[in-house]
Amino acid sequence: MAEVVAEVAEVAEMPTQMSPRVMEMSAPILGEKMELSTELTEMTPGEAVASSLFFQFMCSECGNLYNTLEEVLSHQEQHVPTVTEEEALTTQDTGLEPELVPGTEEGPFQCGECSQLILSPRELLAHQDAHLRESASQIQYQCGDCQELFPSPELWVAHRKAQHLSTAAAKPPVPPPLPPVTPPPPPPAPLEVKMEPYECPECSTLCTTPEEFLEHQGTHFDSLEKEEHNGLEEEEEDDEDDNEETEEEEEAAAEVGDDAKGGDKSAAGQAQGSGDGPPHCTSAGTRRRHRRASHGPASAAHPFYCSQCQRSFSSANRLLAHGRAHVGGTHECTTCSKVFKKAASLEQHLRLHRGEARYLCVDCGRGFGTELTLVAHRRAHTANPLHRCRCGKTFSNMTKFLYHRRTHAGKSGAPPSAAPPTVASAVASLAPAEPTPPPPAPPTPPAQLPCPQCPKSFASASRLSRHRRAVHGPPERRHRCGVCGKGFKKLVHVRNHLRTHTGERPFQCHACGKTFASLANLSRHQLTHTGVRPYQCLDCGKRFTQSSNLQQHRRLHLRPVAFARAPRLPITGLYNKSPYYCGTCGRWFRAMAGLRLHQRVHAQARTLTLQPPRSPPPAPPPPPEPQQTIMCTELGETIAIIETSQPLALADTLQLCQAALGASEASGLLQLDTAFM
């Protein structure tokens, strides 16, 4: 044993360490293995090797560690229960061993290594000795340099002396290798920035060249035109186009004729819609030739004809879009017989007949049935258009502005690219340069006609008059009654008015049986049955059934408020004594009729200012000088009348009277002579 310890001391001086696997395997413990890798890593190499050659034994009951097996066995006897005197007497009577007497044991013993149950402590000791021999035979020692395993520490020490101590003394210490020299990384390549200066305002797409930008804008232009065409097919637009106004007037006149003549047109329409109608044309050219040949030049504006509903269209695209409404279920308007593909489109169209204005203009208060017509109307209020061309034209749509600009710079809209230099151009460049003529002055824009009521200006008098009529003038009444000639703002108002001539009252109250000519009158009447007064005065709390009554009542409370027109929005409390305001001179009027009469005065004055100045009229002749009249009388009779511009003396007056008297006597004698003859 002393020799082994001496060899261990020599090995401790070697600069080697055992692997954690050897340290773990060199510590067999009774019942469990003790992991000493953490503790051994903190020791010196000599202490680690010395500790790896000793065994420790653990008590399976309390976990205490002991260096020898005898100490563990003597310690475990403390855990064995003691035998009482009664149990000893019972053991003597039976003649059995104490550990074998039933009832004297608290329970079987269990091996902490393999968890096997054993009846007696003696069998437990024998069983644990078997585990100890197995663990001792499995212990192997590993060389830290060559990773070779040895069953005993003696062989491991001999291997270390023979193989590694001699080679370590012969070889000089090798310095640690230097880290490899890595070449410096190349400088980063400059980033190529792709310039895309043209951004589409519709979808924010970036384009590199003007050609790509204009081609991309063309897609938005086509979609915009398609949407406008679809909107014109399914909806009645209330814009300021003269052609559409003429068509609506013709429709109103035709409907008036229907009511007056008793439906002659409907019978004619049925006859036209029968099988004798025009044949179905397969192409646009055939349809156009057929319309011109059959219906004359008057139908050239709408050459495309629908064979199912007898409607005509101005383009083939509109006819195709209309034809889709007849496929897969249709929705027909009972008022004007128009056909729609979707129920939502029909409901939107019916709002036009009912006179509903869901889209209001915040500038002038006018109402529109569709959002498309409101957007078209809002362009009239734009003071400065967004896009202005150098030729003087202005555009509110950027796409149309770009297409217009292409007319100035060729098809692509980009400046022409420079041609490659030639020999002639090189020779010409060597010659003395001639003075370049000054660039032509840009064309002057046409004179703008300002609006006298707002800061807008227009290029033509027709646009100015249209703007004043639509924005500043009174509401137009372009729909006329064919019976009495009364004008209305909407076609639905004409239809309601015609019922006053025919005596028709289609709307009946279910509560009292009264009939009314319009749905609005019926709705106001039904408030009398329900007792609901939805309009309340914010000052005194009084309620009214109609907004007009509340408006008249509010004039008693509020002072004048500066707004240009009576509000058409729901009740907000902004009313005053004189709600109608003249934007030209600032006067207020109680009624709209008074404001209209007053605005005619301004209109006449503006008409005189717009007319060219005329030549001054000729000066009137000077008035005649005042004359003095002198009457000469004798015996109550006037014998002479003297008129003079200057007063006469009395003597002169007497002489004139005597001369007149002598002349009168002579004439009297002459008359007597002629009488007697």
Swiss-Prot record:
Record carries keyword Secreted: no
Coiled coil: none
Feature: compositional bias, Basic and acidic residues: 223-232
Keywords on record: DNA-binding, Metal-binding, Nucleus, Repeat, Transcription, Transcription regulation, Zinc, Zinc-finger
Compositional bias of kind Low complexity: 410-433
UniProt biased composition (Pro residues): 172-190, 434-449, 613-626
Pfam families: zf-C2H2, zf-C2H2_4, zf-C2H2_6
Annotated Acidic residues bias: 233-257
Location(s), subcellular: Nucleus
Record region (Disordered): 167-190, 223-300, 408-449, 608-627
Residues in C2H2-type zinc fingers: 57-79, 109-131, 141-164, 198-220, 304-326, 331-353, 359-381, 387-408, 449-472, 479-501, 507-529, 535-557, 580-602
Family: Belongs to the krueppel C2H2-type zinc-finger protein family.
Protein's recorded name: Zinc finger protein 526
Organism placement in taxonomy: Eukaryota, Metazoa, Chordata, Craniata, Vertebrata
